[in-house]
Amino acid sequence: MSRRVGEAGEQAAAEFLTASGYRIIARNVRFRSGEIDLIAQDGGVLVFVEVKTRRGRRYGTPGEAVTAAKQRRLARLASLYLARLGSEPPPCRFDVVEVEPGPDGRLRCRLIQNAFHA
């Protein structure tokens, strides 16, 4: 997947989440060991969001690409982010947004709340 497709997917996911009532706090939060695509707030919950964009289902659904190893890495990155806050961490969860082109070519998003637990 090209970087441009990934960026378009992240933009579509951010717009979708905002329309769903989330407040985007940060995008592409980088650490030495990786990156958190989106960090958002949903009510009183801090949400770490993994965005997976696919052009088709040849290799499965986008969410299937969030392997156990990817989940562990995202959990470690979330811990690093929370340590930066320095205060008592709020309730947190991990969501996945699957992004794929629809029949009309426009990107479609599907939210998987509480996609995994760390």
UniProtKB/Swiss-Prot annotation:
Pfam families (alphabetical):
UPF0102 (PF02021)
Record organism: Symbiobacterium thermophilum (strain DSM 24528 / JCM 14929 / IAM 14863 / T)
Protein family per UniProt: Belongs to the UPF0102 family.
A Gene Ontology molecular-function term? Answer: nucleic acid binding
Q: Which PANTHER family match?
A: UPF0102 PROTEIN YRAN
Protein's UniProt name: UPF0102 protein STH1475
Cross-referenced HAMAP family:
UPF0102
